């Protein structure tokens, strides 16, 4: 386990490692040094007679210093090559020659690993944040590690080769000792894989017979279909259009208002609940059959035997008193990530239009083509009036229940019977299998270079990753959305009435006393049940993932009241600053709105040497 401390001072144009620390997993002896050259020498010496894996907690930050250093040294060479089509590739790690290095940075900027070959052995730098996705402080607390994170003043004149004080040594040593102990515990319970998702999938596959896996989860890319008939080249492409995330929604008309005396209810492990047979949910398996036609055969409506995906063309209008959930991303007609009340298009005057003029000047109606799971299709008919609705085609799978039970039951039992680290690891394994099921072939990655000493990146498109089984990935998230939406609907009594206000994936927020929350079963731990996570005496909900609740109770027990601030993109420092403003009276809840500016945001910026966290102002911008 390793960690870098890097320079932060005023008017900085160059950054460097002024302190590093590393230790073996589970060991108490920490090696501390004062420059990146010595760090590399340490790692090379450790890898003299064996391959080693070195973890950093947030490789995106520390890794920028590693790449910057290696790209600036003639000793090391980036292991890239071009094929005859002009596309770039990295050599595989077992093909590297001495002094060559490769790395995996996704097209979305996720850093996974950096591999360097030296003395015939591999030094692989990995990101422990991909295994334990929490801060070092939280990991130390949750895992009850012997050592706990401390703090120092980050800003100040420090440089490579300088004096490291005893306080600074203690600080950086504690960081690696916390993570060293936590990872040692983790690897006693899990395989050494690059991400928590891959750990989960590895464990799940071990529980599944090879012949069952091949029969239940075939490669959907290997199932070609007629693109002229189904507007897709294979089953994966057809079904993937139905794949959506969680339902996040503030009731229109309840935004930016102060609500009082409310409660927030959370589902106990939403995705594992929906995957468990306790939910009654059946899941698609095997190879689909595709059909054209404007009706779905009656036999396929039996959800205990079949699961289907359907493609429709329709206009839709929200029914009176119902909550919206249809989201259409990637279209100029509609705002992204926004549940829609209608397929009609809002003009510049805020009026809905049933017809639009295209760029070519043609007039067309606002009908849309949607690919839906059977769960979403049923919910669509419950919540919307459908006009000129036509089923274009559909595909049908055989359905099974309980295919995740062995896995879910294993980690549910550990979670219920354990405390501390073991319980936290069980929670990670419960909550991180579902996303891996939706893995696509997209393996696009970034290639780094130095431009005037600053790290720059170019994206190379690639599609050679082994996909998982999108039918189940889509079905899991669909069942989960429906579970939350139906609970919210039972507590929605109108815009001007007390009741449901906001939902975020696995939670509903209502200005109701706990006894008046309807349609949900309350239990502290059971699957498919809800717990009343917190009571609040006042709250404001601005938009998706942007709200504040003044919490008075947690899990039904009184606590010292505090402001729970949730705001996408708002750093911990900015939240602390605004919290202090609320406590002092300098700000009120109504100041939490579009246009708010608060100091304390740290913005990563590439400069010579590596990444600098630049303090700037956080602002709630209007939604694009």
Task: Identify what each model region corresponds to.
Residues 3-10:
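Ser/Thr-glycine-rich phosphate-binding loops at phosphate-binding pockets of nucleotides
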Residues 10-58, 64-624:
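Conserved acidic
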